[in-house]
């Protein structure tokens, strides 16, 4: 294993329901990226944007060479093929690690998955297949964080093989998205140093979600 090397993978929803939140998503992602560029240690960044199709805009790029996300990259529209996006990306990274020299395999691997709606367009992967893939990689020490809006994220995460302790419901608006990326940055910083995520790593998101949900009631 290569010490101080982190495999950091983002799978980000850009379906039609994200319309109006492009600027916040781009800004939140770029702000998080800039913070991580200043931290010690090597990081390989993969970024997959998905609707009914997936597009990989960064494929294991060294973090200091990753360009900022732009409006040309993050164009919303279409449906939500979450299972295909996750399945394809996990398979891709899995195969790279499988055939790499042992000394080149990253010490840490973290997937950050964000969606704002229910799966409704996948044709290549089933939920059972994705769950099996994720559970296999968790046994190898991979971490998966799942952020969901307008769904029961805990239930969806469970169906994907992601424990509720690694799942957060969030408010899909400017404040919620920016809070997501701020918390993700803290989590990435923690894992990059080899520390375990604290039990309350998502406390800020949970509090924002519950407080504003209660106000609506």
Protein language model features and the residues they cover:
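Acidic, low-complexity intrinsically disordered regions
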Residues: 1-217
